[in-house]
Amino acid sequence: MVHGFEGCSDSHYMLGVADKAWRTGLNVIRLNQRNCGGTEHLTPTLYHSGMSDDFAAVIRELAAKDGLHDIWAAGYSMGGNLILKMAGEVCGRVPSLQGLVAVSPNIDPAACVEALERPANWFYQHHFLTGMKARVRRKAAHFPNRFDLTLLSRVSTLREFDDR
């Protein structure tokens, strides 16, 4: 299972669906995207909607090391977009991937950012932007001189955040 933008493996929707799947007898793995769920210290990179390689690597690892050959992926919002992207990229080269479910995937991330910039969606943009700025500050503490924190004070939209 892959969470959405600014979520983590412990997000309420992830826990709820994982619990239901577990109770039906399925094995469940809840993945954190890079830098999410308290993993900022593990890599100097920031996550983004193009990082689908991580999920293909996890599926290959589960097949090779754990002998799992009937794997389904589920992703929410940005996580849904990422697993759809991954499936298109691996297209049959990861035979253990049997299928996937994408819940409310943001198929067009640029259009999603544009929608978030509308005045009616100010709350959501503010929520995401506040979270992303906090994430960069946490990363900067682990990787000094990698991020210019002075730029954060001038960022007021997600588009500006992406551009810097």
Specify the residue positions occupied by each region the protein language model found.
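The conserved beta1-alpha1 loop
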Residues: V2-G4
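Short coil/turn segments at secondary-structure boundaries
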Residues: H12-M14, H41-P44, E114-A115
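Catalytic nucleophile-loop/oxyanion-hole region of alpha/beta-hydrolase
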Residues: K20, R34-W72
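Short, hydrophobic alpha-helix immediately C-terminal to the catalytic nucleophile
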Residues: L15, D19, A56, L84-G88
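Glycine-rich, phosphate-binding/catalytic loops in enzymes
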Residues: G16-D19, L46, V90, E117-P119
